[in-house]
Amino acid sequence: MTVLHWATISPFLLAILIPFLYKYARRIHTGWFVLVLPLVLFIYFIQYLSITSTGGVVEHTIPWVPSLGINFTVFVDGLSLLFALLITGIGTLVILYSIFYLSKKTESLNNFYVYLLMFMGAMLGVVLSDNLIVLYVFWELTSLASSLLISYWFHREKSTYGAQKSMLITVFGGFAMLGGFSLLYVMTGTFSIRGIIENVDLVTSSELFLPAMILVLLGAFTKSAQFPFHIWLPDAMEAPTPVSAYLHSATMVKAGIYLVARLTPVFAGSAEWFWLLTGFGVVTLLWGSTSAVRQKDLKGILAFSTVSQLGLIMTLLGLGSAAIYFGESVDPAFYSFAIMAAIFHLINHATFKGSLFMTAGIIDHETGTRDIRKLGGLMAIMPVTFTVSLIGLASMAGLPPFNGFLSKEMFFTALLRATEMNAFNMETFGIIIVVLAWIASVFTFLYCLIMFFKTFTGKFKPENYDVKVHEAPIGMLISPVILGSLVIVFGFFPNILAYTIIEPAMQAVLPTVLADGELFHVNIYMWHGFNAELFMTMGVVAAGIILFLMMKNWAKAAFYMKERDPLNWFYDSSLSGVITGSQFVTRIQMTGLLRDYFAYMIVFMILLLGYTMFRYDAFAIDTTNVTEIAPYIWVITIVFIVATLSIPFINKRITAVVVVGVIGFLLALLFVVFRAPDLALTQLLIETVTVLLLMLAFYHLPELRKEEFKPRFNVLNLIISIGVGFFITAIALSSLALGNEAGIEPISQFFIENSKELAGGYNMVNVILVDFRGLDTMLEVLVLGIAALGVIALIKLRMTGREDV
């Protein structure tokens, strides 16, 4: 394995050690041990900047299941490096923050950091994997780890509810995405992302193109909380704040963004890709921003703001995909500008949203509440928290001189350029997208005002809090201060990211737009003069202030709408319906009778086999090679059939047991006739022991005054029995007939020819069981051994007098 492979899986390796560190080093906060890893990984990945900034790619492969085209291939290009740096960099700050946020005395830190490391490793696997199946495995691990982190405080009902919702929605999307990956393999013959991009013509010309696209986007939309799948994200805020700052602002919710960006070279250029991304992105942007203003909880506001910002990035990726559609017919920088804005805002969002989640956690930690109706006047009490929050909110609102202003202006520029597009009906619908995005920006500015004024201004009321409010300790402030500082640095000096981060990432998203050696020439600057984008920003500020001042007039109606979210109602109703339906089916099926369970399995087998044989016209009988049946075999068979048919009509249990034993002995006799003495001996032993055990069981049963009972005739059982006999016979005869027709020798011929040669045995039955099916037999013996151990344990427990056994 290469160093890059070890770096990818290193969080999983450290997670194995965490329980031991937690147990034997209780005096040291477990987070200090964990902190070292993401910091080292961040420094390790920084060294790749010199490679990716010149267009280089690093790739290493370890075969996993090469026969199926599945290999553990890790590769670093501009896009994967951007996400790797976000995962490890933000991860370092989040773990540092968690050390002071979570008490080592009261919290189960071993669980928390195991889950967090598992999530970090899964995210690294997602962004560094070249193989789609490996990516899918890590993708589902992110869902699992996220669910565990959300339900970290599992004693809270809302935590488990949020974890379940997150798991169900994202795993549903993951399964759909796996279907899309499978279709891509069918079209191209490879699971390699780079291989698929190289064979993109095979994808675009296939009739499976659209189904694959929709399935892949289902995975991306559910993971990145796009409308209408966004409903899991607000409920995920029940997780500890370090989890919210990490998973739901900088990493997990960006996994869908990564997938869309990574597969843009495959699907971009089609109207369906353009409109699915742009349409769902704009709706998500608008829905998230309007929902945020209706929240009363700080983390609730930030959750919906995250939904909104993810919609913004998705919209930009959709608009930027036009660069591949137009190719060299227009200036590459014209539409690729949207991709540049998406990447830049991806970074900006991680900085300002991460800092805001942390300050929200600080406020909750130090005041005991996140309810904006109780908060107020914290500006003087918590000056550092106030300063960091002000920077983050100003950036999120799109105010200069912060980085959020730059990416918001770039967003407006991309929207206006899209209206000039003479494709995808943008000449008709382009202005609608601009208007919806502008309205969403107004509400974005509005919820930033609400957070700021409701939390930090006004009169401080100590009676609203159960604790004495004070500023957070310095250790808890370090991480949000660093992120807040980056907001300012990237605002004043955005081009420090231009050729090291943004340019290489753009080349990975749009590899076919430029000729070899050409660059996108990323250049971001603050002042563009008095243009349409600036006037749009001024309009956003003015409209946002007016709505804030008129808040008393519309707030009551907005909060009323919040309590009646149709999407959450639909989810809850659907889940309740599934549970009710499952309980109904369970009551019908789980009768506690073994014969019913056998009937279910047998009926399913009959239906499946019957459909298959009728569907493919597989019924055939060939009597040319049928061996003549000897008279004594006829006698044995007739007695066998008569004994079997008599069982339902016997009204004494002991007699029925004896007849069943007779059937077993007749079967053993047939084995002797067909020269299988070992099978005959085994059958004789089994039947003898079974009959004796049943007789012994009758001895220990309670005494019954009347042993005889009246047998009941069941038509359904008769139909099932006839169906099984018919189809098993039909399969046997059809297999022989079709095999003879196709010139295929029966499989028994192989064992006849190779039993002595390959296994050194003359008894084919023994050779099959011990050699050709040796592994199967070994596992059967293992199962029997486990069952025997279980019986011994039960007997010993019973002998000790345990009444609960």
Curated annotation (Swiss-Prot):
TM stretches of this protein: 4-22, 29-51, 80-102, 109-128, 132-154, 167-189, 209-231, 244-266, 271-293, 300-322, 332-354, 375-397, 431-453, 474-496, 529-551, 597-614, 629-651, 656-674, 679-701, 714-736, 778-795
Pfam families: MbhD (PF13244), MbhE (PF20501), Proton_antipo_M (PF00361), Proton_antipo_N (PF00662)
GO molecular function, one term: antiporter activity
Record bears the keyword S-adenosyl-L-methionine: no
InterPro entries: CPA3_Na-H_Antiporter_A, MrpA/MnhA1/PhaAB, MrpA_C/MbhD, MrpA_C/MbhE, ND/Mrp_TM, Proton_antipo_N
GO biological process: proton transmembrane transport; sodium ion transport
Record keywords, A-Z: Antiport, Cell membrane, Hydrogen ion transport, Ion transport, Membrane, Sodium, Sodium transport, Transmembrane, Transmembrane helix, Transport
Localization per Swiss-Prot or TrEMBL: Cell membrane
Gene Ontology CC terms, in alphabetical order: plasma membrane
Membrane topology label: Multi-pass membrane protein
Assembly mode: Forms a heterooligomeric complex that consists of seven subunits: MrpA, MrpB, MrpC, MrpD, MrpE, MrpF and MrpG.
NCBIfam families, per database record: 2a6301s01 (TIGR00940), PRK12645.1 (NF009285)
Family to which the UniProt record says this protein belongs: Belongs to the CPA3 antiporters (TC 2.A.63) subunit A family.
PANTHER family named among the record's database cross-references: NA(+)/H(+) ANTIPORTER SUBUNIT, NA(+)_H(+) ANTIPORTER SUBUNIT A
Function: Mnh complex is a Na(+)Li(+)/H(+) antiporter involved in Na(+) and/or Li(+) excretion and Na(+) resistance. Na(+)/H(+) antiport consumes a transmembrane electrical potential, and is thus inferred to be electrogenic. Does not transport K(+), Ca(2+) or Mg(2+).
Note: Mrp-dependent antiport apparently occurs by a secondary, proton motive force-dependent mechanism, but the similarity of several Mrp proteins to membrane-embedded subunits of energy-coupled NADH dehydrogenase complexes raises the possibility that there is a capacity for electron transport that could provide a primary energy coupling option for Mrp functions.
Protein name per Swiss-Prot or TrEMBL: Na(+)/H(+) antiporter subunit A
